[in-house]
């Protein structure tokens, strides 16, 4: 992946930053890939760093993600709710699956999407081809059902929908436009020029 470098010139000196470090300087975190352990650890570290820098100033998280690992996404979610600064969320492009979950987890009144963004919610998936004894598969299935239930509870809390409606609406992939995401309660408004 190409990682651009930007030059910051304050009139007295110049400093080169990779683009993500430059964004971080302005309290911006960019989630631009699928969420896995490495991505989650980086985002969590950035959230904690920005809280330590100024616990009163908002953090802005831009999301363009197809989703990813539930456990890694939940670690980000918990950190967003643990730190003192409000986390504004902005969808650019897509926020699908765990990306949509994190988009909805932003501070109330501070959750946005650009006009042509797409948001997709669905139930959690097992990936990687589950193998093993029937008992082990049953254990994994029960855990997946618990995760599905917990995600529905949290999404209901963040959207104002009932848990039952969330469970119905996430039974299959459910794609929403930015406006539909506002009406659903996933975001608060659409950014337009």
Swiss-Prot record:
<dbReference type="InterPro" id="IPR033135">
    <property type="entry name" value="ClpP_His_AS"/>
</dbReference>
<dbReference type="GO" id="GO:0004176">
    <property type="term" value="F:ATP-dependent peptidase activity"/>
</dbReference>
<dbReference type="InterPro" id="IPR029045">
    <property type="entry name" value="ClpP/crotonase-like_dom_sf"/>
</dbReference>
<dbReference type="GO" id="GO:0006515">
    <property type="term" value="P:protein quality control for misfolded or incompletely synthesized proteins"/>
</dbReference>
<keyword id="KW-0720">Serine protease</keyword>
<protein>
    <recommendedName>
        <fullName>ATP-dependent Clp protease proteolytic subunit</fullName>
        <ecNumber>3.4.21.92</ecNumber>
    </recommendedName>
</protein>
<dbReference type="GO" id="GO:0009368">
    <property type="term" value="C:endopeptidase Clp complex"/>
</dbReference>
<keyword id="KW-0963">Cytoplasm</keyword>
<dbReference type="InterPro" id="IPR023562">
    <property type="entry name" value="ClpP/TepA"/>
</dbReference>
<dbReference type="GO" id="GO:0051117">
    <property type="term" value="F:ATPase binding"/>
</dbReference>
<feature type="active site">
    <location>
        <position position="122"/>
    </location>
</feature>
<feature type="active site" description="Nucleophile">
    <location>
        <position position="97"/>
    </location>
</feature>
<dbReference type="Pfam" id="PF00574">
    <property type="entry name" value="CLP_protease"/>
</dbReference>
<keyword id="KW-0378">Hydrolase</keyword>
<dbReference type="InterPro" id="IPR001907">
    <property type="entry name" value="ClpP"/>
</dbReference>
<dbReference type="GO" id="GO:0004252">
    <property type="term" value="F:serine-type endopeptidase activity"/>
</dbReference>
<keyword id="KW-0645">Protease</keyword>
<comment type="subunit">
    <text>Fourteen ClpP subunits assemble into 2 heptameric rings which stack back to back to give a disk-like structure with a central cavity, resembling the structure of eukaryotic proteasomes.</text>
</comment>
<dbReference type="GO" id="GO:0005737">
    <property type="term" value="C:cytoplasm"/>
</dbReference>
<comment type="function">
    <text>Cleaves peptides in various proteins in a process that requires ATP hydrolysis. Has a chymotrypsin-like activity. Plays a major role in the degradation of misfolded proteins.</text>
</comment>
<dbReference type="InterPro" id="IPR018215">
    <property type="entry name" value="ClpP_Ser_AS"/>
</dbReference>
<comment type="similarity">
    <text>Belongs to the peptidase S14 family.</text>
</comment>
